Amino acid sequence: MIRIKTPEQIDGIRASCKALARLFDVLIPLVKPGVQTQELDAFCQRFIRSVGGVPAWFSEGFPAAACISINEEVIHGLPSARVIQDGDLVSLDVGINLNGYISDACRTVPVGGVAHERLELLRVTTECLRAGIKACRAGARVRAVSRAVYAVAARHRFGVVYEYCGHGVGLAVHEEPNIPNVPGLEGPNPRFLPGMVVAIEPMLTLGTDEVRTSADGWTVVTADGSCACHVEHTVAVFADHTEVLTEPTEVERTG
């Protein structure tokens, strides 16, 4: 069932999203060569507790506050002693439960001297996200977002992960509807309605669209070992516009 949020609930979700945007302000500068991903996760946990929140992923059984995925890791990267290297693409997928309201966003950070093809992957994935958000309007169907995301990726001949997708969010981490990044897949295709809050999250690769789960039971990697990129925003749908609730703050924009 799709959960239509009240204005008061959207206010609560917005507050959670603003806290998450502030977290990214201070987290992204810490993503440097020599840093362990578990150090970044510990920082996220401290920040989230400091604002009165709880790491959202705990409710899903994930044992960390942040999914930190590097290079061939697509999503759900389990923080560990893995050390960030110069040239890495590091995805930071974080959610906050603040007073029962859930935020969800992902930023991908290029570290040091990143290869041109990886920077292009990041640029295009970000373009896909913008296209998906533009297509997310009251009255439009979910697959309009799928088509918009896929069209950008296909134009640049990048792989598009189809096994994972965007989703409703706000009162739980994962709500209906699912929002695929590939059109033509089977499944419901409802219209976006005012009061819906969703996470739009393109996942692109330099190679295959196939993925597998690593031995840790969480980390999803590309089947061919190619580099991946993941970006995500939480957005709220209104009758006359769509609001990006996890929009970067001025600090992050100018950082």
Curated annotation (Swiss-Prot):
Which keywords label this protein?
Aminopeptidase, Hydrolase, Metal-binding, Protease
The answer on whether this UniProt entry bears the keyword Transcription reads no
Q: Which Gene3D superfamilies match?
A: Creatinase/methionine aminopeptidase superfamily
Q: Has the keyword Metal-binding been applied to this entry?
A: yes
Residues the record lists as binding a divalent metal cation 2: D104, H167, E201, E232
**Gene Ontology terms, MF aspect:** initiator methionyl aminopeptidase activity; metal ion binding; metalloaminopeptidase activity
Extract one GO cellular component term from the record: cytosol
Q: Which reaction does it catalyse?
A: Release of N-terminal amino acids, preferentially methionine, from peptides and arylamides
GO BP:
proteolysis
| Cofactor dependency | Co(2+); Zn(2+); Mn(2+); Fe(2+)
Residues engaged in binding substrate: H76, H174
Q: How does it assemble?
A: Monomer.
Q: Which PANTHER family match?
A: METHIONINE AMINOPEPTIDASE
Per the record, the similarity remark reads: Belongs to the peptidase M24A family. Methionine aminopeptidase type 1 subfamily.
Q: What is this protein called?
A: Methionine aminopeptidase
- Organism listed in the record: Treponema pallidum (strain Nichols)
Task: List the gene name.
Answer: map
